[in-house]
């Protein structure tokens, strides 16, 4: 039973319950009847064994199909095809009765299914609206064969029969132990009027009340049944009810046609020996008029085939769904493998990148880089190849030299202006001049050959002195508000140390400019150096910056010391 998924309870009774389930393998929806612990209850075991035995030998389009039988933990499980609709559901939906044509089709199939059972000497004994299933295509299927049994041999008696009272024949009510197929025909007669009028024909509250309703509509019981009644200890001290005023079917249901009344009366004959067989009922005028029987037989075959196709399509749809789920799971596994592949050791990731972006050097260095690219361990340390990187490539990169003591330094490019041609682009300044109000994105930069936490000595603050002064002069003249000065006067703005912390070393220059302003001295031409980020502690770099010459190879002395281990 592990291959079935429980989808909910359909119904339950005295001997067990019916559950709606799904086959996990095929996806087919089934109905599973779970009996109570049959090993502890002989009656439950008897009913389960009887239904299993009968349904295994019964295969018909108007009988529910038994698919599988299994036993688990003293319980029997019967797996049926699932049909979630019954005639009782129709009657609850249409309390005033069903359409005549619908009833005609239902009755034809009910009689056809019961006739098939009778042809195999099996009586159902519990025909009622809730035991008659209707598929989506309108195919009727009899179910619940728990009370069904084979006909007794001559002289053999049946056990006590307990079923739904409203559809019970008179011979069953009085306790006759020799009954036969006619009990099912009686139940058919009760269904005829109930489906057309929407109300049960004999809704008795007790067995004696049931007998009273039958006798009032159909007359007195036959002598044999009356004798059995008075011999039955169940009715000891009770007399058969006297009928003062009868109410036949014609008077009770005046709207029903004569053909329908005739069909019901033949099925409801008080003498079971005078009730017709199912084959005779199928030839009744109710089914033969207008060629209904022949026409509907062909239609019924199409309905059965349609149901079979629906089951097949359901299986295929479920199989496609399972295949899609498998494909999705395989896709997820592939994604997981890709993620795992991208999360490999950084040695291999570095080797893949550097093989593509390696700098063009002589053949000997290439061979060394390739050997380093596979990240082979030589001694206690690792040797890694590093690509040549421009200033533009390292705009947001920080190099931790303490964590990478063995990193090799690529050859430096001497023309630094060519290395970083786009640094000043988009800043709104004249060529060669870099405004100290830099954009937030350009405040952080890194050059692999400069110590961390230290600004670059080239490029950004490499300016023309004369051009810088004239630009600052124009800015100061536009902001001048007080006093009259000569056109050649220059006022230096107050420096904000938040922007250029490196300018603290130039306080002397700013102080001299304020003294010049107080003395109102006229300057013919200002030769004040640009407010560049000059590192006074590295005179070689400062000299090259002021003169505008490129950084010589001697600047490598200011690069972080790297130890090469072989």
Swiss-Prot record:
Region (Disordered): 307-334, 545-566
Main subcellular location of this protein, as a coarse class: cytoplasm
Active-site residue list: 126 (proton acceptor)
Top EC group: transferase
UniProt KW ATP-binding keyword: yes
Matches recorded under SUPFAM superfamilies: Protein kinase-like (PK-like)
Every Protein kinase domain range: 4-287
Family membership: Belongs to the protein kinase superfamily. CMGC Ser/Thr protein kinase family. CDC2/CDKX subfamily.
Protein name per UniProt: Cyclin-dependent kinase-like 2
Organism: Oryctolagus cuniculus (Rabbit)
């Amino acid at each position: 039973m592990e291959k079935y998924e429980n989808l909910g309870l359909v119904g339950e009774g005295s001997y067990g319950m019916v559950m709606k389930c799904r086959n996990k393998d095929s996806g087919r929806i089934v109905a599973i009847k779970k009996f109570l612990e049959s090993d502890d209850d002989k009656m439950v075991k008897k009913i389960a064994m009887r239904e299993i035995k009968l349904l295994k030998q019964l295969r018909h389009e108007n009988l529910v199909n038994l698919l599988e039988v299994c036993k688990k933990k003293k319980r029997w499980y019967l797996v049926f095809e699932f049909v979630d609709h019954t005639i009782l559901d129709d009657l609850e939906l249409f309390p005033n009765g069903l359409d005549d044509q619908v009833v005609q089709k239902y009755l034809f199939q009910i009689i056809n299914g019961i006739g098939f059972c009778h042809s195999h000497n099996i009586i159902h004994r519990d025909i009622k609206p809730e035991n008659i299933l209707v598929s989506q295509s309108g195919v009727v299927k009899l179910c619940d064969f728990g009370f069904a049994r084979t006909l007794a041999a001559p002289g053999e008696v049946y056990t006590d029969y307990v079923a739904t009272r409203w559809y019970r024949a008179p011979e069953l009510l009085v306790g006759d132990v020799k009954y036969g197929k006619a009990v099912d025909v009686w139940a058919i007669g009760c269904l005829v009027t109930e489906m057309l009028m929407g109300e049960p024909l004999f809704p008795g509250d007790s067995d004696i009340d049931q007998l009273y309703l039958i006798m009032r509509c159909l007359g007195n019981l036959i002598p044999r049944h009356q004798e059995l009644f008075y011999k039955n200890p169940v009715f000891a001290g009770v007399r058969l009810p006297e009928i003062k005023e009868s109410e036949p079917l014609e008077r009770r249901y005046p709207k029903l046609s004569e053909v329908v009344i005739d069909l019901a009366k033949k099925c409801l004959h008080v003498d079971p020996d005078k009730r017709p067989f199912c084959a005779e009922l199928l030839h009744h005028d109710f089914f033969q008029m207008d060629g209904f029987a022949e026409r509907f037989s062909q239609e019924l075959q199409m309905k059965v085939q349609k149901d079979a196709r629906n089951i097949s399509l359901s299986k295929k749809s479920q199989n496609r769904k399972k295949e899609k789920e498998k494909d999705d799971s395989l896709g997820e596994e592939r994604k997981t493998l890709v993620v795992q592949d991208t999360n490999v050791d950084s040695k291999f990731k570095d080797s893949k990148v550097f093989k593509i972006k390696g700098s063009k050097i002589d053949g000997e260095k290439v061979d060394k880089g390739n050997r380093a690219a596979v990240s082979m361990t030589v001694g206690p340390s690792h040797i890694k190849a590093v690509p040549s990187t421009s200033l533009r490539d390292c705009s947001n990169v920080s190099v931790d030299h303490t964590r990478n003591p063995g990193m090799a330094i690529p050859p430096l490019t001497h023309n630094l202006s060519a290395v970083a041609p786009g640094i000043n682009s988009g800043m709104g300044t004249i060529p060669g001049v870099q405004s100290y109000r830099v954009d937030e994105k350009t405040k952080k930069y890194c050059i692999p050959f400069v110590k961390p936490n230290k600004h670059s000595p080239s490029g950004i603050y490499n300016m023309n002195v004369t051009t810088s002064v004239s630009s600052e002069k124009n800015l100061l003249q536009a902001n001048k508000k007080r006093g009259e000065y000569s056109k050649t006067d220059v006022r230096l703005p107050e420096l904000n140390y938040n922007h250029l912390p490196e300018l603290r070393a130039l306080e002397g220059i700013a102080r001299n400019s304020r003294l010049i302003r107080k003395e109102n001295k006229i300057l013919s031409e200002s030769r004040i150096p640009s407010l560049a980020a000059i590192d006074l502690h590295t005179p070689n770099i400062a000299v090259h910056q002021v003169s505008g010459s490129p950084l010589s190879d001697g600047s490598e002395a200011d690069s972080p010391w790297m130890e090469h281990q072989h």
